[in-house]
Amino acid sequence: MSSWYDAWADRYGDWSTGVTADVPFYVGLARDADGPLVELAVGNGRVAIPVAQATGRRVIGIDSSPAMLAQARVRAVEEGVELDLREGDIRELEIKEPAALIYCPGRSLLHLPTWADRRRCFERVAASLRSNGRFAWNAFAFDHHLASAIDGQHADTPLPHTNYYSVGDNRVDST
């Protein structure tokens, strides 16, 4: 999975600049959290940096892409915030101190290839949270009407991947 993100890392910053609608939600959760903050699929720090700025606290960021983590490190220094950035697979999350908040913005959980992968991620998150900790993520609501209009191969995306929408199978694949 990381090779695709490594290849896209240089363009992600430009694309993500205007993607901010979810940031206040995660900032609010982080302000209410009393303990460690962990962002899964931290990417270039799009959400982690504003969370760290708003809370004045360090955010642990996990990502499988070295190129994205390198961008997050540069951006964190530029913004004067502390991020503890770690290369890793969110399906194998391990942190020493249980977290008060673990969050995964940007529909990143949907990038895990199988339901078993998502389940494994949820299991690791549950094992990594404090007893009163929270896990927050977002996902899109599948729209059958929209998908049926573009059912089959959709190859005109600006990124090097293909989306496949199959209404009959109730699935959306990104490869």
Where are the language model's segments positioned?
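A short His-aromatic
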Residues: 110-112
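A conserved beta-strand element that flanks and buttresses the S-adenosyl-L-methionine
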Residues: 103-105
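Conserved class I S-adenosyl-L-methionine
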Residues: 1-43
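SAM-dependent methyltransferase
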Residues: 136-175
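A short acidic, Gly/Pro-enriched loop at the edge of an enzyme's catalytic core
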Residues: 94-101
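Class I SAM-dependent methyltransferase SAM/SAH-binding core
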Residues: 48-92
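A short glycine-rich, Lys/Arg-flanked "PGG" loop and its adjoining helix->strand segment in the class I
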Residues: 119-131
